[in-house]
Structures are given as C-alpha cells and as structure tokens.
C-alpha cells in the first residue's frame, strides 16, 4: 500500500474502533477516554471537584490542565474529538464559556453524548477533523485532547483549526507520540501558522495518573466479556501492558501545548 493511503487507513481503523466502543459500551458513567493527569510535585494541591466528578478525577485534571490554560469565560469553544462528551461537558459547566461544541467522527459517540450530557450552551455534532462543518473564524478556542494520534499527518487538521479560529483565538492541544515521532509532531505544530505560546512535557503526570487510576479502570473493564477484555486492557494502558510500559520508560512522550492565531 502506498504511503499516501496510510493516513486514510489509520483514520478508518480508528473510526471503526471508536464506533464499536460507542455502540457496545453503554455504561453511562464512562464519559472520558483519556489517560489522565496527576500531580507529581510535592505540595501540589489537588483540583477541587464536585462529589459526582470524583471518580473521573484524573481524566478531568487533564482537561483542566489543557483547557484551563487560557480564560474561556464568555468564549465560543470547539472540542475536536469529543468522544463520549465528558470533557466538553466539564468545560461547559466549570469554565463559564458562552458555548461549547463537541465534534467527533464517530456518530455513535455523538449520539451517546447528546443523550448523556445536557447543559445550556453545550452541543455535539458529527464531523471530521480534516473537514470541519463550521464557518471561518467561528471559535475563540479549539481544544484537542489525546485524539490527534488517530489522524495521520496533521497538516489538514491544523489548517482547519487555523480556519475556524477567530483572530487571537487559541488552540489548546495535548497528545502523545513515540520518541521517534515526537519531533515530527513539534514540526507540524510549528508550521501550522499558529504561534506556540507554551509547550509542557507531561509524561510523568500522565504515567502517575495511569498508576493511580489502575484499580478503578480495571474494575470497569472487568464488566466486559473475555473476548474484548485483553484489547481494553491495552486501550486503557493498564499496568502490565506495553502501553503502560511505554510511558514508564519514556518510549512514548506526552506533551501539552498552547498555540495562538495571530
């Protein structure tokens, strides 16, 4: 198969995976799919959460780290790759934006999110990261958390981010790559036409989250049947999987970035 087709194949494969997840995993309490973020510095104060949010603490802390990097009060916010909607819903109810639109390629995930999350100013729509169904300069901020590794090369996605952002808007990004691929990701971000305001390596925070959240995720995954159990172990980067080890050894590096449109 030619290299030109590989990005499309990657997108199709991940699309199939997330459609399957959304259609088969009906547990309404499962609204986040990221690896999470935990403090690693002595003396760091835990994020204050409502009691209902406590089970999702580490997932929420990643969204707080990424989306909380700029003031979203009164802003129109887009999340690309909103999954099961927990991140968009958290941003909407805690950061006082004017609106939050969650967009995902998997229509089943969009349908789940529409049913599961209801809040003034919050909506979910189907759409592709490389052809967003929005007018130019529609949003003050675009959020993208742990999703871009499913896209292949990012040039078209970043072009779309640039297009839908208003002048002086922000792109709030977090994802991981292998040690061999991380510099290519940085180059793609640098050549996007957006100005890099800040980059933070958060691999230790993500790995600590995987350690602390292991038991809760294991108990959730044990509800699934044996045929898919081993797949979900790896998907969730449970202890003992190669994904868990890749963050422990640094083979995978996780970064968060704030970029601004001039």
What annotation goes with each model-predicted range?
Residues 155-167:
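A short glycine-rich, Lys/Arg-flanked "PGG" loop and its adjoining helix->strand segment in the class I
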Residues 203-262:
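Conserved Class I S-adenosyl-L-methionine
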Residues 1-34:
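N-terminal auxiliary segments of SAM/dcSAM-dependent transferases
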Residues 56-73:
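Conserved alpha-helix/loop element of class I SAM-dependent methyltransferases that forms part
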Residues 130-142:
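A short acidic, Gly/Pro-enriched loop at the edge of an enzyme's catalytic core
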Residues 141-152:
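A short SAM/SAH-binding and catalytic strip from SAM-dependent methyltransferases
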Residues 169-175:
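Conserved beta-strand signature within the Rossmann-like core of class I S-adenosyl-L-methionine
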Residues 78-80, 84-131:
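Class I SAM-dependent methyltransferase SAM/SAH-binding core
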């Amino acid at each position: 198969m030619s290299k030109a087709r590989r990005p499309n194949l990657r997108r199709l494969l991940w699309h199939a995976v997330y459609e399957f997840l959304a259609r088969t995993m009906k547990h309404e309490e499962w609204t986040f799919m990221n690896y999470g973020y935990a403090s690693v510095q002595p003396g760091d104060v835990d994020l204050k959460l409502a009691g209902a949010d406590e089970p999702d603490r580490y997932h929420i802390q990643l969204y707080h780290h990424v989306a909380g990097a700029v003031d979203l009060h009164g802003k129109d916010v887009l999340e690309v790759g909103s999954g099961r909607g927990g991140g968009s819903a958290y941003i909407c109810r805690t950061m006082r934006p004017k609106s939050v639109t969650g967009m995902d390629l998997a229509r089943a995930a969009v349908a789940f999110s529409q049913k599961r999350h209801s809040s003034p100013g919050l909506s979910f729509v189907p759409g592709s990261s490389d052809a967003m169904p929005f007018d130019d300069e529609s949003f003050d901020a675009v959020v993208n958390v742990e999703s871009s590794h499913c896209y292949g090369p990012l040039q078209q996605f970043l072009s779309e981010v640039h297009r839908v952002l208003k002048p002086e808007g922000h792109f709030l990004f977090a994802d991981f790559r292998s040690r061999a691929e991380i510099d290519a990701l940085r180059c793609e971000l640098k050549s996007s036409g957006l100005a890099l305001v800040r980059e933070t390596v958060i691999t230790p925070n993500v790995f600590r989250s995987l350690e602390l959240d292991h038991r809760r995720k294991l108990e959730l995954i044990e509800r699934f049947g044996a045929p898919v159990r081993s797949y979900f172990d790896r998907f969730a980067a449970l202890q003992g999987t190669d994904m868990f080890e890749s963050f422990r050894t640094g083979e995978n590096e996780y970064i968060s970035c704030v970029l601004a449109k001039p």
